[in-house]
Amino acid sequence: MRHPLISLLLLIAFYSTSSEAFVPKCNSFYVRWPRVRLNFKAVAEARLSLKGCQSACSLGEDPVSPGKQLECAAVNHQASPDGFSHLCAVFQPHQLQNVDGYVEADDRFTFYWKYCLPSTRKCSGEYAFTYLSDRYMDQKSVIKWTTKANLEECLSDCLDEKSFECRSISFNRTDGGCHMSKDSQISRPEAIRLNNNPNYRIDYYENNCYNLSESFTFKHECRDNGISVSVKSRLPYTGAIYGLYDFFTCRTEPKEATEFDHFFPYQTVSKNCSDSIKYKGNEMVLEVVLSTDGIEPLYFITPEDLTYQAKCPISGVKAKDPANTKSSAHLDNRNKAMEASAHALFELLSKTGDDEALQNTFPLPLTTTTEVIRQVTTTTKKPSTTTSTKKLTTTTTTTPKPSQKPTTTTTKSPVVITTTTKTSPKPTTSPSTTTSTTTSTTIPPSTTTRKPANPRRSTIMSATSKVAIIVGKDSSFARARLFTTKHPSTQKIDVPTTTVQTSTTVPTTPSKTTATTTTTPKPTTTETATTSSSTTTVTTQKPTTVTSTTTLPSTTASTTTKTTTSTPTSPQTTTTHVGAPASSVASVAHDGSTLAGKPKVPVIFDIFHNGQPVEAVVVGTKISLSFRPHYPIPPEYVDVRGCQVEPIDPKYEWEHEPLFIIRDGCPADGVGLVCPPTHSEFGAKVSVEAFRYQTTGQVQYSCLVRICPFAPCPKNTCDDVEGCDSSYMHRYRRELSLEDIKKALEANPELASQFGISPSAFARNPSKSKNFTSVVEEQQRIALGGDYLVRRRLIVVNSEDQLRYYVRTGNI
């Protein structure tokens, strides 16, 4: 008799074996739905790569809690460029009963549906089939037709087919028809049909167990004038091979070919493939794309497309030989010698005026004196007593010990003052006050005289010459530049007194004021170029006694020195230029009228669709880039020189470079349909096809617009583009003619202010239309003349549903 414990163990083992026998073993195969996202909540979400996400789904594990069982029927995956922020969303079978109403297009996601197939074949890729809804292979390309109970049997038969290579199937969900073919959308894309029959549902599945990278073999050959790339395909291929950034000008479209090639010329030979060839070090790198996803337009790059890099050395680049090395060393020595000579010359110029005496009179009108700025400090063991005797008047001042903090104020904006004095028969005497510094600490009186420490440099010259020498301020050496002017612009302003504030920063030293009188016996014209920086310094001093005997005007010694120069009462002509004139301020013409000023936004850039400004469109939509000057000048004076489109925050590195759509006033064939620039009402426009990048829907258009101020811009002769109006660059008729505008301005001259011109220009001679044309068009064109870089952003979505979602929520 058996032991009861043994019977119990045998019973448990039998039940365990029976339960394992009844559990069906799933051989997981995934069907990919590209660019699809399910818009309902998943049962679990985790940050896993696609391989980890599919592994958890195949094993029936929870991706969040490894080891915990979770039934999985499909996953929605979003790949992240950084390799860490992936998104894996898991769905169970009961959630997939009816997914047709919950599928939305999203380039960021891919949906993978898991099928348990009885096939024993193993696929090396991440998925076995690619799904296309409501499509099927043409009956002429179908080799085998059977009836199956479900989709799983049809997929399994395609994987296990031995008589031919099953590249695709078309499964009829209504009658169970399984149509197998040896062609695919790569070999015969034109054979794929769209199902428009509402009586049955049929879908297309392409077999991806054939590795695409093994199906194509790339080779390239480096030539003197370009790079030749050849491709061999295991199966007949139909598609396109093209340069990454030059689809429209640099491509070949083979039709059911097994061997094909394309020649990519260098930039020095042709510009057709110039954007796809980059220089990296001593090599030229060509980036080639082979379209394998079957998605049109073919220039829309997807991760399924194959990319190939061909590298060739730059012709003419050789290693340095001894002769080249010797010449390079000789050139370096020459450069060093020139630098040393320049430094010696600059040092000599900076020391030129140290030992020269101060010249008080100028006997010749062409004498030019340049003073070198030096700060001189003398330290002795004597008290500081400064005496300047001109008359018998003596003033004694005792300064108490102040205790204040140093305060320094610096004005960075340069001020240039030019003073022109008319000829006077009498000699002119101009007193000038300069400041020097002396430091002392003993008792015997002594007088110390130094050169002026004025931080300004001046040049006095004759009025008969038209050449002005302007000496700029520099801390190490004097630098002179020569300018010639024929017609200087002047403005008459009566300036009886000119006051200039200067200061010298001196640590713990008193100041001494020296009055110097300069007498010019002959009539002269003085032009002074001054660059001033206002600085105020307050220092702490000991009680000192300063004795000064001067004539009026007198200057009291203090830390801050103010110098006042009184000019003769004779009429003067002064031209003052302070910085650059403001662009928004109107200038004054010779006749007193106000000229049109340059506005803050000279060219207005808008994007239109069907005559309405837009900020979001569907990819492939025809839009118009409109450029309108601020003033209503004729469109012949507006020219679009160049345009490019670039993504906003793309995820892939190859998407960062902008694509040109207009170059030198003509289409650049960068991407999509681009028409030549045309004239529009008061401006220009460019009709293009909205382009979208793979990882971002936000793009930016940047264009260079030229306003020709004096004559109509030269016309550009561009080749005709299919899909564009051949009669481009024509001018539209204005709704309001120039005659109507002229009559309105003559009736009410105050309306002229709306054009940025003076109403007095029409009040003087309102009967002449020539005056109107010259004032309105010429002044406004001159005000707007130049090149302007304008930018505009646009959101490009994939479908009308996404566009409605964006309009409703504001999110992409």
From Swiss-Prot:
GO terms for molecular function: structural constituent of cuticle. The lineage of its organism: Eukaryota, Metazoa, Ecdysozoa, Nematoda, Chromadorea. Residues 375-461, 494-584 are annotated as: Disordered. Disruption phenotype: Lethal at the larval stage of development. Defects in the development of the excretory system during embryogenesis and the early stages of larval development. Dilated lumens of both the excretory canal cell and excretory duct which become apparent between the early and mid 3-fold stages of embryogenesis and increases in severity as development progresses. Lumen dialation may be as a result of fluid accumulation due to blockage of the lumen. At around the time of hatching, the autocellular junction, which usually seals the excretory pore tube, is absent. Keywords: Cell membrane, Cleavage on pair of basic residues, Developmental protein, Disulfide bond, Glycoprotein, Membrane, Secreted, Signal. This is Protein let-653. It comes from the Eukaryota. Gene3D superfamilies: Hepatocyte Growth Factor. It comes from Caenorhabditis elegans. One of its GO terms (biological process) is cuticle pattern formation. PANTHER family: FI18240P1-RELATED, PROTEIN LET-653. Residues 221-725 form the ZP domain. Required for epithelial tube development and shaping. Involved in the morphogenesis and function of the three unicellular tubes of the excretory system, the canal cell, the duct cell and the pore cell. Also plays a role in cuticle development, alae formation and shaping of the vulval lumen. Required for larval development. Disulfide bonds join C26-C116, C53-C88, C57-C72, C123-C209, C154-C178, C158-C166. GO terms for cellular component: cytoplasmic side of apical plasma membrane; external side of apical plasma membrane; extracellular space; supramolecular fiber. Residues 26-116, 123-209 form the Apple domain. Residues 375-449, 496-584 have a biased composition (Low complexity). Glycans are attached at N172, N211, N272, N771. The gene is let-653. Residues 1-21 form the signal peptide. The keyword Repeat does not apply.
